[in-house]
Amino acid sequence: MANLGYWLLALFVATWTDVGLCKKRPKPGGWNTGGSRYPGQGNPGGNRYPPQGGGTWGQPHGGGWGQPHGGGWGQPHGGGWGQPHGGGWGQGGGTHSQWNKPSKPKTNMKHVAGAAAAGAVVGGLGGYMLGSAMSRPMIHFGNDWEDRYYRENMYRYPNQVYYRPVDQYNNQNNFVHDCVNITIKQHTVTTTTKGENFTETDVKMMERVVEQMCVTQYQKESQAYYDGRRSSAVLFSSPPMILLISFLIFLIVG
């Protein structure tokens, strides 16, 4: 972690030094760079001709009549007629490029809504996330009939749970209670729409199965949450990071 902080400090100092050198470099060119090299030089013989930089009348930078930078008539920077910056008719930038320009296709909101629904199923559940698939636990219900029924029907029960981030709950019980309710509700609704119904025995077994999976999900999310907080605390308390932050404050204040 300390090595990472040193590398960040070195990278920032190198970047800041390069920016400072770029600011000190003189801008290329000088007076009268680009275009005609003799702006005030007219054609011998009076004022019959305007100042020229090469080419015929009306050519500030060469080309045919009306060509500021070369090309055919009406070509500011070369190309065909009506081409501000080259290309075919009606191409390039400027207002002329809008002629005969095809209109942008309108976004089909039905397609957008369908894509959102297909790619973010949990988005409509108010911030719930879908956990990774788990193996359904082997549970004993107290009698042989229920144990056999569970083994024969366990594939019909959820193997993923819905949950919210652990930092939104005060304790594990609240997390598990919410997780069980939303998971069974969503699974029941989804399965019912496919023409399959659950009995009271199914619901009883699902509650036991989902409860164990929600406990496992809570333990996993809690560990990841606290590991992330600890890593952030170690990073920002390391000497290189403190030095980097102090250097940034010095640059801002100075």
Curated annotation (Swiss-Prot):
Monomer and homodimer. Has a tendency to aggregate into amyloid fibrils containing a cross-beta spine, formed by a steric zipper of superposed beta-strands. Soluble oligomers may represent an intermediate stage on the path to fibril formation. Copper binding may promote oligomerization. Interacts with GRB2, APP, ERI3/PRNPIP and SYN1. Mislocalized cytosolically exposed PrP interacts with MGRN1; this interaction alters MGRN1 subcellular location and causes lysosomal enlargement. Interacts with KIAA1191. It is found in: Cell membrane; Golgi apparatus. Sequence repeats lie at residues 51-59, 60-67, 68-75, 76-83, 84-91. The normal, monomeric form has a mainly alpha-helical structure. The disease-associated, protease-resistant form forms amyloid fibrils containing a cross-beta spine, formed by a steric zipper of superposed beta-strands. Disease mutations may favor intermolecular contacts via short beta strands, and may thereby trigger oligomerization. Contains an N-terminal region composed of octamer repeats. At low copper concentrations, the sidechains of His residues from three or four repeats contribute to the binding of a single copper ion. Alternatively, a copper ion can be bound by interaction with the sidechain and backbone amide nitrogen of a single His residue. The observed copper binding stoichiometry suggests that two repeat regions cooperate to stabilize the binding of a single copper ion. At higher copper concentrations, each octamer can bind one copper ion by interactions with the His sidechain and Gly backbone atoms. The lineage of its organism: Eukaryota, Metazoa, Chordata, Craniata, Vertebrata. This is Major prion protein. Cu(2+) 3 binds at H77, G78, G79. Residues 25-107 are annotated as: Disordered. It comes from Sigmodon hispidus. Residues 23-231 are annotated as: Interaction with GRB2, ERI3 and SYN1. Residues 232-254 form a propeptide.
